């Protein structure tokens, strides 16, 4: 089961705050304070924090990371929690970076960053 499917199944069946709590709205489940899971369409799933899709998985195996202009410790923690294994957001000298440790370790400045074809990771 890939990460996207795992998120969907976990949040559909969750019944307590630590595992997720259904909101009663179709396609939306509260994961923890102000963090929601949302089915964008039949192929796309997003983790939404304070109204911003911070991690978005599409049906092609691509992942989009987005801080929405809110560079807080909690936003960074939520992105790291739901990003694919091997992709990490960190801060150095007040700037955000993304570290990709999957194949050849590399570090790049954080923007609204899209990872192509990470299907085998998610």
Protein language model regions, located:
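Terminal leader/tail segments of proteins
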Residues: 1-122
């Amino acid at each position: 089961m890939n990460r996207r499917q795992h998120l969907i199944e976990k949040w559909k069946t969750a019944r307590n705050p630590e595992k997720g709590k259904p909101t009663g709205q179709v396609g939306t489940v509260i994961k923890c304070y102000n963090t929601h899971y949302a089915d964008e369409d039949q192929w796309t799933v997003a983790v939404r924090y304070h109204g911003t899709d911070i991690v978005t998985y599409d049906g092609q195996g691509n992942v989009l990371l987005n801080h929405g202009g809110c560079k807080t410790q909690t936003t960074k923690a939520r992105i790291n929690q739901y990003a694919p294994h091997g992709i990490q957001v960190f801060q150095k000298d007040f700037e955000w970076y993304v570290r990709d440790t999957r194949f050849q370790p590399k570090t790049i400045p954080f923007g609204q960053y899209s990872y192509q074809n990470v299907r085998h990771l998610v």
